[in-house]
């Protein structure tokens, strides 16, 4: 059934201060990616000139990828350096990718060089190398209190909402194709495309939310949905691909649905269990092995646990901003098949599927929520359905025949991603101000104070004021004991958190004070003994 498939798991993680990994790794459901394996288990070893050419090509590919990432880092630095905070980093990097792709295309057209293989973005590179730290950072910077307080709403939007959107988009594409309005796709291919295009990635929108200080509940609903939504979208896409690879000609529609449901549940809950188990093990390891005095070892252990579940899922068959540069490059890198009617109808279906997802579920949730989701918040949530790196990489990974169908899906996905990032993402800030979503303090801010840089805010959690001002002991004394927590929140605060996290001892506090005093004295001596009147030193002090 799954012998010819290798699967990859998305492992989210989040920690307390001091890099202690806790139970809260479950806040991002891990997923697997079904990747086709080679037909032969062992590839023949190449020698001679062919091996040398392959080695040179691999070296150039690595060089080109690192060069793109380095240029992206420099671009983000320049945005911060010159305070271009009004421009989201994802939009800037996409524009950079488009520019680089155009330059490479001109060079190839002039026959000065041929970098077609080197500039080609491989989906395996994204899922195996770039995706783990992206998901890890999302979980690491997430405030667990706000997340678990809204876990029911977030799960409903991420799981059922994504499924609704996938069925609406996939069903619409299938029936429009049968009516000869657009190119025909079979049911499984339509559902696969509907699933991959339902993965939201509101990077620019979250940056705007943080800059304008919108309602924390709105911020958390959009951010939390985007984390879990990616997982559900990947699993749904894998489910459709798994059905495509099977011989479904003699199977009824009801049996197909049951097989798809069985495949989805196994992947979804199996992935979540594997990610949770890995997170708990990492929490216990970091609790009982104190690596804080050796930061290099601590950092290495964190990287290992971030990547570990991916390799484990592969074996048992079970930085996002820079990715946008490859998305821009792909405009000129891949052969495209552009069909205007297909693109327009897909955009309409994506927006309609998002509306069918957000508005009915929000009205349903308001019957059970104390903090109601207002109509303005619903509209912003619908408008925040940007697409990003996940749909793009999944579209490259789809194994569709004939090739024209695959090119059509890939081209349409790129257009939808660029449409949502540039148009919807670019108009989110004026829309929020027009609808008066931001708080009173944010309205008094000057436009120059608005900061859309994700990098500058890296590591800052989305948190509530009544939680951010409390230490662990104060939180336990004033919040847990007084508020009478129930359900999982009580279980987490009472048992799981103390068991899986390491509290600071008096000895730790003593060593911390000594280290801080030593560093302060050292810094003071360096400043006092430095050359007086140096403009460089004065600039550093400023």
UniProtKB/Swiss-Prot annotation:
Q: Give the sites modified to Phosphothreonine.
A: 471
Membrane-spanning regions, if any?
55-75, 79-99, 118-138, 151-171, 186-206, 256-276, 306-326, 349-369, 374-394, 412-432, 446-466
Coiled-coil ranges (or none): none
| Molecular function GO terms recorded | potassium:proton antiporter activity; sodium:proton antiporter activity
Q: How does this chain sit within the bilayer?
A: Multi-pass membrane protein
Tell me a GO biological process for this protein.
acrosome assembly
Give compartment(s). Golgi apparatus membrane; Golgi apparatus, trans-Golgi network membrane; Endosome, Multivesicular body membrane; Apical cell membrane
Q: What is its main location?
A: Golgi
Which InterPro entries does the record cross-reference, listed alphabetically? Cation/H_exchanger_CPA1, Cation/H_exchanger_TM, NaH_exchanger
Query: One cellular component GO annotation, for this chain's record?
Result: apical plasma membrane
Instruction: Cite the Gene3D superfamilies for this sequence.
Output: 6.10.140.1330
Q: Which residues carry this modification: Phosphoserine?
A: 532, 534
Chemical reaction(s) catalysed: Na(+)(in) + H(+)(out) = Na(+)(out) + H(+)(in)
Which keywords annotate this record? Answer: Antiport, Cell membrane, Cytoplasmic vesicle, Differentiation, Endosome, Golgi apparatus, Ion transport, Membrane, Phosphoprotein, Sodium, Sodium transport, Spermatogenesis, Transmembrane, Transmembrane helix, Transport
* PANTHER family registered for this protein in UniProt: SODIUM/HYDROGEN EXCHANGER, SODIUM_HYDROGEN EXCHANGER 8
Q: Which family does it belong to?
A: Belongs to the monovalent cation:proton antiporter 1 (CPA1) transporter (TC 2.A.36) family.
Function noted in UniProt: Na(+)/H(+) antiporter. Mediates the electoneutral exchange of intracellular H(+) ions for extracellular Na(+) in 1:1 stoichiometry. Acts as an Na(+)/H(+) exchanger in the trans-Golgi. Contributes to the regulation of pH regulation of Golgi apparatus, and consequently, in protein trafficking and endosomal morphology. In germ cells, plays a crucial role in acrosome biogenesis and sperm development, probably by playing a role in the fusion of the Golgi-derived vesicles that form the acrosomal cap. Can also be active at the cell surface of specialized cells.
Q: What is this protein called?
A: Sodium/hydrogen exchanger 8
Q: Which source organism?
A: Macaca fascicularis
């Amino acid at each position: 059934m799954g012998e010819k498939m290798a699967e990859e798991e998305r492992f989210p993680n989040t920690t307390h201060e001091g890099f202690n990994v806790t139970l809260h790794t479950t806040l991002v459901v891990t997923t697997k990616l079904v990747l086709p394996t080679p037909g032969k288990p062992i590839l023949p070893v190449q020698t001679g000139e062919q091996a040398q050419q392959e080695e040179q090509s691999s070296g150039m590919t690595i060089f080109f990828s690192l060069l793109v990432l380095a240029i992206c880092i420099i671009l983000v630095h320049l945005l911060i350096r010159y305070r271009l905070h009004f421009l989201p980093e994802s939009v800037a990097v996409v524009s950079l990718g488009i520019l680089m792709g155009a330059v490479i295309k001109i060079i190839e057209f002039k026959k000065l060089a041929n970098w077609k293989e080197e500039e080609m973005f491989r989906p395996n590179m994204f899922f195996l190398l770039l995706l783990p730290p992206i998901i890890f950072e999302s979980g690491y910077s997430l405030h667990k209190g706000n997340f678990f307080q809204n876990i029911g709403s977030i799960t409903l939007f991420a799981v059922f909402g994504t499924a609704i959107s996938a069925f609406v988009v996939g069903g619409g594409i299938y029936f429009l194709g049968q009516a000869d309005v657009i190119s025909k796709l079979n049911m499984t291919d339509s559902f696969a495309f509907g699933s991959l295009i339902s993965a939201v990635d509101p990077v620019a929108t979250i940056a705007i939310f943080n800059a304008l200080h919108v309602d924390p509940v709105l911020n958390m609903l959009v951010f939390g949905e985007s984390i879990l939504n990616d997982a559900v979208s990947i699993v749904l896409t894998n489910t459709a691909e798994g059905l495509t690879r099977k011989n479904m000609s003699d199977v009824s529609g009801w049996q197909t649905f049951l097989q798809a449901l069985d495949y989805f549940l196994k992947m979804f809950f199996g992935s979540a269990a594997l990610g949770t188990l890995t997170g708990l093990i990492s929490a216990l390891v970091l609790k009982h092995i104190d690596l804080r005095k050796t930061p290099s070892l601590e950092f290495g252990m964190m990287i290992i646990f971030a990547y570990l579940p991916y390799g484990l899922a592969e074996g048992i068959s079970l930085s996002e901003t820079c990715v946008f540069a490859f998305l821009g490059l792909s405009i000129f890198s891949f052969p495209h098949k552009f069909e205007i009617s297909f693109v327009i109808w897909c955009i309409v279906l994506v927006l309609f599927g998002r509306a069918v997802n957000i508005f009915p579920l929000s009205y349903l949730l308001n019957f059970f929520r104390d903090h109601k989701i207002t109509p303005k918040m619903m509209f912003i949530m619908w408008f925040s359905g940007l697409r990003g790196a996940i749909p793009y990489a999944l579209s490259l990974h789809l194994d569709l025949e004939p090739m024209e169908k695959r090119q059509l899906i890939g081209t349409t996905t790129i257009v939808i991603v660029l449409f949502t990032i540039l148009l919807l993402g670019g108009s989110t800030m004026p829309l929020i101000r027009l609808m008066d979503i931001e708080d009173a303090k944010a309205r008094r801010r000057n436009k120059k104070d608005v900061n859309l840089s994700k990098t500058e805010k890296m590591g800052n959690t989305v948190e509530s004021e009544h939680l951010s001002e409390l230490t662990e002991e104060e939180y336990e004394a004033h919040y847990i004991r007084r508020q009478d927590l129930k359900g999982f929140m009580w279980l987490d605060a009472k048992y799981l958190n103390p068991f899986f996290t390491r509290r600071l001892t008096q000895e730790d506090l003593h060593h911390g004070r000594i280290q801080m005093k030593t560093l302060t004295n050292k810094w003071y001596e360096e400043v006092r003994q430095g050359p007086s009147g140096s403009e460089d030193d004065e600039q550093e002090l400023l």
